[in-house]
Amino acid sequence: MTKVNDFEFVRLVGTERRVGTTLESVSKHWQKDKECFLFVSPHDDDVVLGSGLLVQLAKRENVPVHILIVTDGSMGYCSFEEMATISYIRRKETFECYQALGVPKENIIWAGFPDCQLSGYRGRRKAINDDKAVIQNFSGLQNAFTYYLRQIRPTQCFVPTSNDLHPDHRIVYEELLISLFHASGDIWPELGEPLAKVPYVHEFGVYCDFLQPPQLKMKTPESYLENKVAAISAFRSQKQISSLIDIVRKGGPEEYLHAVEFRLYQPQRYRAVFEEKDDMFFTR
């Protein structure tokens, strides 16, 4: 049986160090029963590898969790025999994985973009015959992300760091961030009611480190780590899964997040830099 003191959350805000035993206790923007988390996963296993503890922590605080898996898993085969069936296999493994962490099956969503081909789906365009992930006669990552953001209406979004080597991770990061503003604006009304405000966004690490240090540390009981490892083990088709589990175990029952800040351009911010100043004389 876990105790409250088995959980530790530390958030760094400037020179302030906030410590608590819940996510809510270290958050300035917590929206009580309106909280809703959306994890955007370039590939089916990215969220469990980078945020398998956080998914469980959300459940602990009664926050609904939705997982949007961007690609179809078609490039994940490790044998010739699997080439034609790997998407189906990965889909079954994915449901097993995230349902084991308490995510309802209906909250596990597949966008359906072809694995390793996301560069061809940047932006939004009128769908043509062989396009994938068609919504309202349009295709493209920004079309899909805007649609799902408006349908799910999350208060917070989580996505792998932009510093990852995998092009799919980088593309998803970039396309999601601009889609947050699309989803909060009035364009493309056929994709749903605009969001009242832009959700807060956090990066989590999967394979590569953060570009800038994280600001939130989450520490859980060992049982949460064992649940995470068991969920990762659902991806039996992936031959390298044992090495990934070793890495996760060595990291212990801890995960970290980096908050993404949108620093919008404001000319007045630079005005003082260019103002004429009195000459300054220095004495030795």
Residue ranges of model-derived segments:
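Metal-dependent de-N-acetylase/amidase catalytic core
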Residues: 1-38, 61, 85-86, 99, ...
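ATP-dependent adenylation/pyrophosphate-handling site
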Residues: 26, 32-85
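Divalent metal-coordination and catalytic microenvironments
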Residues: 45, 71, 94, 108, ...
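Short amphipathic alpha-helical segment that frequently serves as the phosphate-/nucleotide-binding helix
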Residues: 48-52, 91, 173
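Hydrophobic alpha-helical membrane-insertion segments
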Residues: 52-54, 80, 111, 121, ...
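A structural preference for short, hydrophobic beta-strand core positions in alpha/beta folds
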Residues: 67, 110-111
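Glycine-rich phosphate-binding loop and adjoining beta1-alpha1-beta2 segment
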Residues: 73-110
